[in-house]
């Protein structure tokens, strides 16, 4: 039933509500699992969401569902049904996991390790249910070797080119803290009172790790780190051919039910007709209405009313600044409130930072009319003339209590106004919302997380000054800045490192480092900031102490990382080296595959060999699982590097296990795939079986499978299952051939 309603598609970090996911007919894993848990609970089946904060062997994370059946928890892939429980495409990745979390209502006294406790819920570690584990103990001492009590200890996994904190503990009176995790490597970071120390912990190998707080935020140096993830050891329940056939039949039926609903969404032709009838910009209107999916009626009603009120241009501007996900679930009340209570747009800055209802990842609400009514005219004018007065008002009137909002869900701006109590994040969103309601451009900087506003200069927004908001400071200031330049000596397979894929920057605050969130481009596709457009010619950063992390992910999942610490000084340029470490191993023959193996090319009735299709030389062969998340990731990764594969020029043969599987494949979901691809059917699963046997894969059913081989029947690369960055891994090997 859940698969009838929702399938997987990547999206931004805000989690849609269960009913919003139904309306859209798709969602990312966190939304699929939230929806499925809600559905199971609604019919009396105990259920919970389980997630890994970050994978260790590949970038990204994942969430799924556990249901309570006959006195035991069983897992499954949310809206991705398998014939039996305890089976999903993620069995193999989960066996390589470091941590798995879930939440339990209230206090908890069970056997699982407690990760985090609040008055409302307890977060527990359920990694023992999925992978072999070991306990790692950490002793934190000062420079004299004395144990340090109440030091903060962060356990970090390398993922998306940063060391991401997956667990935070505090040392006891003897200076100890511990964690149970999968048998791989983490970076452990300890800090207290401005001093810090760190070291690599290999779970299952290191019984106790000693960390000395002997570092401070002034030292400049660089060091390499080799990070090894847990080994794979998937335990897969048996599925009979009859069960698989019946499951495939049901999934096809469920697809047809969902697709019948999706067919009711507005079409491009209907959207174009609507735009013409209302004299709207055709290109933008069509794009916005198609993107709204099941919410298209809300947008057409809103635009129709805006045309009648002679506000069509501003209405389009409003829809352009909200997120793609907002288009799919925004309410008429929100759109009308912000259209009718924001003044007239004067610039791009106005649209983004006054008209825009969204501040961070909160549920957007209709707050502008409320604030215009509640704030006395004299105060409103004083705030506009001097936004510092609004900062002071917030400091005086809003009490901060981070303990009361234990679920960390942002309060609405109106809720903060009425309660006069909020957590820090909700207070920050409230300040920006209130400022925008008064016509003051304000925002939370996406890179640094700083709250900022722009002053008026003779009513000219463009010439106003940008100030940082510090609720602890007596006066708001413009932060002093310096410039960071990074030198990079290209390695053969990488001319322009990407942010999140190959490197990140973090700023030192309160004893630890906080990531700078530069643009990542399309979700799940990398893109965005790179070395050449960010650091080659220099970028301005606030003064302070920083860390650059770089990493080369190997096909095994291991990482060759490098960490560089440096300081940015006011008005000065700091130059560092961006080091991408390389494996010293040359491309090696790791197995065999018969290039005379045959498959059935799509659109033909005669089998053809791989050799006939590809000619002499190297080629890529893959067996795909249509509609499955790991295959979708792989195809998006390949599309992202389409130009590289075109330049290589060799054939890629992408096969499906059956004609039925091929019919489920929608190439339009993966724009930009290279023209060198040939699609076909792996008749009777012969090629899939051969790859699994010759490469000694632990399970022959996990898809996708990719190999790079040649017509001498040698294999130099193999990948199976869920891998982020597959396209890049393929190109690394190709560059080494």
Positions of PLM-derived features:
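Short, acidic Ser/Thr/Gly-rich low-complexity loop/linker segments typical of extracellular
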Residues: 159-181, 510-535
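Structured interaction patches on ligand/partner-binding surfaces of diverse proteins
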Residues: 194-216, 553-581
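Hydrophobic/aromatic-rich core segments of domains that either
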Residues: 1, 9-19, 24-116, 187-189, ...
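Short, internal strand/loop/helix patches
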Residues: 668-703
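A short, amphipathic beta-strand motif
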Residues: 134-145, 175, 482-495, 589
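Secondary-structure boundary elements
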Residues: 1-24, 243-245, 254-419, 429
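Short active-site neighborhood of thiol/selenol oxidoreductases, capturing the structured segment around
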Residues: 610-638, 651-655
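Short, ordered, surface-exposed loop/turn motifs in non-cytosolic proteins
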Residues: 135, 143-162, 183-185, 386, ...
């Amino acid at each position: 039933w859940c698969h009838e309603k929702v399938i997987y598609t990547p999206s931004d970090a805000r989690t849609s509500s269960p009913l919003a996911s139904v309306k859209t007919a798709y969602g990312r894993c966190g939304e699929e699992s939230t929806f499925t848990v809600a559905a199971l609970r609604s019919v009396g089946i105990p259920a919970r969401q389980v997630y890994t904060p970050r994978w260790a062997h590949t970038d990204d994370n994942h969430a799924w569902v556990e249901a309570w059946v006959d006195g035991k928890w069983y897992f499954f892939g949310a809206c991705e049904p398998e014939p039996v429980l305890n089976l999903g495409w993620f069995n193999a990745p989960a066996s390589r996991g470091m941590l798995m979390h879930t939440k339990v209502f209230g206090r908890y006294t069970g056997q699982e390790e407690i990760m985090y406790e609040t008055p409302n819920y307890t977060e527990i570690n359920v990694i023992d249910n999925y992978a072999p584990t070991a306990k790692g103990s950490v002793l934190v001492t000062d420079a004299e070797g004395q144990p340090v009590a109440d030091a903060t200890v962060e356990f970090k996994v390398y993922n998306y080119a940063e060391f991401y904190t997956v667990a935070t503990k505090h040392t006891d009176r003897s200076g100890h803290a511990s964690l149970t995790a999968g048998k791989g490597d983490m970076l452990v970071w300890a800090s207290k009172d401005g001093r810090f120390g760190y070291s690599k912990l290999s779970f299952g190998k290191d019984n106790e790790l000693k960390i000395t707080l002997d570092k401070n935020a002034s030292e400049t140096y660089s060091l390499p780190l080799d990070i090894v993830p847990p080994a794979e050891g998937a335990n897969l329940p048996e599925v009979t051919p009859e069960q698989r056939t019946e499951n495939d039949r049901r999934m096809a039926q469920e697809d047809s039910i969902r697709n019948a609903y999706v067919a009711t969404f507005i079409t491009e032709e209907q959207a174009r007709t609507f735009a013409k009838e209302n004299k709207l910009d055709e290109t933008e209107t069509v794009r916005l209405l198609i993107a709204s999916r099941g919410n298209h009626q809300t947008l057409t009603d809103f635009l129709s009313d805006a045309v009648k009120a002679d506000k069509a241009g501003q209405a389009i501007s409003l829809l352009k600044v909200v997120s793609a996900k907002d288009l799919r679930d925004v309410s008429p009340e929100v759109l009308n409130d912000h259209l009718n209570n924001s003044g007239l747009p004067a610039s791009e800055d106005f649209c983004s930072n006054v008209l825009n209802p969204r501040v961070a990842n909160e549920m957007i609400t209709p707050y502008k009319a409320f604030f215009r009514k509640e704030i006395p005219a004299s105060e409103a004018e004083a705030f506009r003339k001097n936004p510092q007065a609004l900062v002071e008002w917030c400091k005086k009137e809003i009490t901060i209590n981070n303990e009361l909002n234990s679920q960390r869900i942002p309060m609405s701006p109106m809720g903060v106004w009425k309660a006069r109590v909020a957590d820090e994040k909700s207070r920050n969103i409230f300040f920006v919302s209130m400022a925008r309601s008064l016509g003051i451009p304000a925002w939370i900087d996406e890179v640094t997380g700083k709250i900022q506003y722009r002053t008026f200069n003779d009513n000219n927004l463009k010439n106003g000054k940008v100030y940082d908001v510090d609720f602890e400071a007596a006066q708001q200031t413009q932060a002093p800045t310096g410039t960071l330049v990074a030198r990079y000596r290209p390695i053969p397979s990488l001319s322009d490192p990407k942010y999140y894929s190959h490197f990140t920057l973090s700023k030192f605050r309160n004893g630890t480092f906080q990531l700078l969130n530069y643009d990542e481009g399309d979700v799940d596709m990398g893109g965005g900031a790179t070395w050449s457009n960010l650091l080659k010619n220099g970028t301005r950063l606030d003064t302070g102490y920083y860390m650059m992390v770089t990493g080369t992910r190997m096909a095994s999942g291991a990482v060759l990382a490098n960490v560089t610490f440096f300081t940015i000084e006011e008005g000065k340029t700091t130059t560092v080296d961006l080091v991408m470490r390389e494996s010293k191993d040359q491309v090696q023959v790791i197995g065999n595959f018969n290039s005379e193996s045959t498959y059935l090319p799509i659109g033909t009735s005669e089998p053809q060999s791989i050799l006939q299709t590809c000619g002499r030389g190297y080629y890529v062969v893959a067996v795909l699982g249509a509609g499955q998340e790991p295959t979708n990731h792989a195809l998006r990764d390949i599309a992202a590097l389409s130009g590289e594969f075109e330049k290589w020029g060799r054939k890629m043969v992408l096969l499906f296990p059956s004609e039925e599987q091929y019919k489920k494949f929608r190439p339009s979901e993966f724009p930009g795939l290279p023209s060198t691809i040939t699609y076909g059917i792996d008749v009777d699963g012969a090629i899939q079986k051969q790859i699994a046997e010759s490469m000694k894969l632990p399970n022959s059913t996990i898809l996708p499978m990719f190999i790079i081989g040649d017509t001498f029947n040698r294999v130099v690369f193999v990948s199976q299952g869920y891998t982020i960055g597959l396209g890049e891994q393929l190109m690394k090997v190709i560059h080494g051939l």
